[in-house]
A protein has these predicted regions:
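Bacterial Sec-dependent N-terminal signal peptides
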Residues: 1-22
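Metal-dependent phosphoester/phosphodiester hydrolase catalytic core
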Residues: 20-451
């Protein structure tokens, strides 16, 4: 009887402690010697720490206590784990109010390897997608729920990959959300707590940008009055090494993985209204901005100085689609031409755009004489409603890669593989059930300026 009592007490205590975790854990960035781990705890929690150790050395445990304020309505927390060993698997667990969570709640990550000047660039794969709508009937529009079957998030967790990139509209602020700071905080916390999200967020590192719906109202621009609130919320829920540049606000950033660089763009914070005229007095409207001068200059400097074989520009809306609606960089003629001219004039190899937003998936290829073909791969939506683009004028699109159009809930996996100077990118589209629907490869030579 005493043994049974002890077992029951342990089970109840473990359940109580784990119930104090509202959402998470989520892996943020993971570098060679540092990693970020995110979690959100209940308002009742008075103290939380993280205990971590090399997987092969259980005796070498380190505990970091959270020093910030707790017991707020919402308590998103980021632990930064410093001075890690390279190319090493670590395990971790949380300690809440002095008690460790059940051993079944031990999580794992692995730091990056130092491969440069030592070995070939590692092959890798990452998941990419956009538009995650979590139903919340109190605040949703009447009628059929807009959010689709969240089982796709479980399928993403089961799909082999090294990290995730969330391509914007990672949640949807409703009218009752984006009208107040408390509404915004509620939406970020509510959607992050979705049960189906937890495994995919804990499985591997996560990187993210936003688009209009996690920034503010539909098609929102730099005039949105609470953009600093959503900016801070985004940073609190997606921990990265840095955001913006030189004290400039915005969620743009970059990171490198193996021999690829990722330039994560902010297409909202400095964006002019779509409705502003594209032309003034017969000339492009130079005041109609998309990225803004500082962000665009940051991108130029980052691109021209990058030694990566592949340079992925990640954006919330499409870049190259010539028949897209107003939500495309191509509709912002001045900045679009400036960026394309810069890439071509400076003969920057390996540039590929990966984008979200459209509620269908496709790839565009644009040919320019004397330069390599440029690609824009769009992956959308994960759980949001699907857009029947095949019933619109966009159904016939001369730049769409044949077979790439997929209309349905989906996510994508992008892989980089191959020997030195013969690297290739492989794009894969998976449906709601995790079934492969389309595959396409581009080799390094195809993304190299002709000599």
């Amino acid at each position: 009887m005493k043994k049974l009592f002890i077992v029951l007490t342990f089970i109840l205590l473990s359940r109580y402690i784990f119930a104090q975790i509202v959402a998470g854990p989520m892996l943020g960035y993971v570098e060679h010697r540092e990693a970020a781990i995110w979690v959100e705890v209940d308002a009742k929690v008075g103290k939380i720490g993280i205990e971590y150790w090399p997987k092969t050395n259980l005796q070498n445990k380190i505990i970091i206590q959270f020093k910030g304020e707790l017991k707020n309505r919402y308590n998103p927390i980021t632990f930064e784990l410093p001075e890690l060993q390279m190319n090493t698997a670590y395990q971790y667990q949380f300690v809440i109010d002095g008690k460790a969570i059940s051993p079944s709640k031990i999580y794992e990550f692995k730091t990056k390897d130092l491969w440069e000047w030592r070995k070939p660039a590692p092959d890798f794969k990452f998941l990419f997608g956009s538009c995650v709508y979590i139903n919340d009937s109190i605040y949703d529009r009447p009628g059929k729920p807009y959010g689709q079957n969240p089982i796709i998030l479980e399928k993403m967790a089961d799909t082999e990959a090294d990290f995730n990139i969330w391509g914007g509209d990672n949640l949807y602020l409703r009218e009752a959300d984006y009208s107040s700071a408390s509404g915004i905080a509620y939406r970020y916390s509510h959607d992050r707590a979705a049960l189906e999200l937890q495994r995919v967020l804990a499985a591997r590192p996560n990187y993210a940008i936003w688009d209009d719906h996690d920034y503010g109202p539909n098609d929102s621009n730099h005039s949105y009055g609470l953009k600093n609130v959503t900016y801070n919320c985004f940073k609190n829920y997606f921990p990265q090494r840095n955001y913006g540049y030189n004290s400039t606000e915005g969620i743009y950033q970059s990171f490198k993985y193996s021999d690829a660089s990722f330039f994560m763009m902010d297409d909202r914070f400095y964006r002019s209204a779509n409705e502003l005229p594209d032309m003034l007095d017969g000339k492009p409207n130079a005041d109609k901005t998309y990225y803004g001068n500082q962000q665009l200059n940051w991108l130029k400097n980052a691109l021209i100085s990058s030694n990566a074989v592949f340079k992925f520009i990640v954006n919330g809306s499409q870049i190259l689609n010539p028949v897209a609606d107003k939500e495309c960089l191509r509709s912002y003629d001045t900045e679009f031409k400036e960026l394309m001219k810069f890439i071509q004039t400076n003969k920057i190899n390996g540039v590929v755009f990966i984008t979200g937003d459209r509620h269908f998936t496709e790839m565009h290829k644009i040919s320019t004489p004397g330069f390599y073909d440029m690609y824009d791969f769009t992956s959308s939506p994960i759980t949001s409603g699907v857009y029947a683009v095949d019933k619109t004028k966009e159904n016939i699109n001369p730049t769409r890669v044949e077979g790439s159009l997929f209309i349905g809930n989906s996510y994508s996996r992008i892989g980089i593989s191959g020997p030195k100077k013969e690297r290739k990118i492989t794009f894969e589209i998976f449906d709601q059930q995790g079934q492969l629907k389309w595959e396409y490869s581009i080799n390094q030579a195809q993304l190299t300026v002709p000599k």
